[in-house]
Swiss-Prot record:
ATPase required for the correct placement of the division site. One of its GO terms (biological process) is cell division. This is Putative septum site-determining protein MinD. InterPro entries: CobQ/CobB/MinD/ParA_Nub-bd_dom, MinD, MinD_FleN, P-loop_NTPase, ParA/MinD_ATPase. Keywords: ATP-binding, Cell cycle, Cell division, Chloroplast, Nucleotide-binding, Plastid, Septation. ATP binds at residues 25-32. Its main location: plastid. It holds the Pfam family CbiA. It is found in: Plastid, Chloroplast. The gene is minD. Belongs to the ParA family. MinD subfamily. GO terms for molecular function: ATP binding; ATP hydrolysis activity. It comes from the Eukaryota.
Length: 282
């Protein structure tokens, strides 16, 4: 099975990008980020594989609305119970997007670093241009296995001191494991709280961590509705600000640097005001 649809040429062998989405702290929106970035990149025409590496606590299938189509998992591949093409679930909405789910009934110690590397290598052989790995929370063996084949990382955090401390720890571990291309995504930003000095601005968070900013996602109650429906925010017919922010982050991730919001613009439209709120600009 070769995923031949998509943007770019089909001579991208060896140019695949393997990106781990991680956080350190649970509950910051890492899986939501994986689903929305992956779907956005697929909608831009690229071949995308999403891999849920959170053994025993998988949720990526739910956020994508694919839970009823999971017949085999990565564990079944490791144990020789099925082939990779049998376990990969192709999204019916965007056929250049596929999901490889992980087992709900196993422990993280059932998969080795080598197992994960072999899985990623096999996925890359199918012609995917982007492989996004939803990393488990924490910094134990599950984290080490999930980052084994990644060349890049996106650290997801919120403007809370505990989440920032964990993100800093994760950044150090990524560097120690040879992953130097790291970007920051700050989730659940509340402009109203930033104005009142009740929340750190995105600029504060970025300066504390010293990581290039990929995007800032405003707090959005639509996330709950989106999760329950099994549809990423970026698929909403009427995009919310968080959906737009995820789409812009995805464009920046693939190298479309022209999608940064221009702070030098004399017009203070909605997006510039949001940028000012997020970055603490006057």
């Amino acid at each position: 099975m070769v995923f031949s649809t998509g943007n770019g040429d089909d001579n991208s062998k060896g140019l695949e990008r393997v990106i781990v989405i991680t956080s350190g702290k649970g509950g910051v929106g890492k899986t939501t980020t994986t689903a929305n970035l992956g779907m956005s990149i697929a909608r831009l025409g690229y071949r995308v594989a999403l891999i849920d590496a959170d053994i025993g606590l998988r949720n990526l299938d739910l956020l994508l609305g694919l839970e009823n189509r999971v017949l085999y998992t990565a564990m079944d591949i490791v144990e020789g119970q099925c082939r990779l093409d049998q376990a990969l679930i192709r999204d019916k909405r965007w056929k250049n997007l596929a999901l490889l789910a992980i087992s709900k009934n196993r422990q993280k110690y059932n998969v080795t670093r080598k197992n994960m590397q072999n899985l990623i290598d096999s996925v890359k052989e199918l012609g995917f241009q982007f492989v996004l790995i939803d990393c488990p929370a924490g910094i134990d063996v599950g984290f080490i296995n999930a980052i084994a084949s990644a060349q890049e990382a996106v650290i997801v955090t919120t403007p809370e001191i505990t989440a920032i401390r964990d993100a800093d720890r994760v950044a150090g571990l990524l560097e120690a494991n040879g992953i130097y291309n790291v970007k920051l995504l700050v989730n659940r930003v509340r402009p109203d709280m930033i104005q009142k000095n009740d929340m750190m601005s995105v600029r504060d968070v970025q300066e504390m961590l010293g990581i290039p900013l990929l995007g800032a996602i405003p707090e959005d109650t639509s996330v709950i509705i989106s999760t329950n429906k099994g549809e990423p925010l970026v698929l909403n017919k009427k995009l919310t600000l968080s959906g737009i922010a995820f789409e812009n982050a995805a464009r920046r991730l693939i190298g479309k640097q022209d999608y940064f919001i221009d702070l030098t613009s004399p017009q203070k439209g909605m997006f510039q005001k949001l940028q000012e709120f997020f970055l603490g600009e006057e």
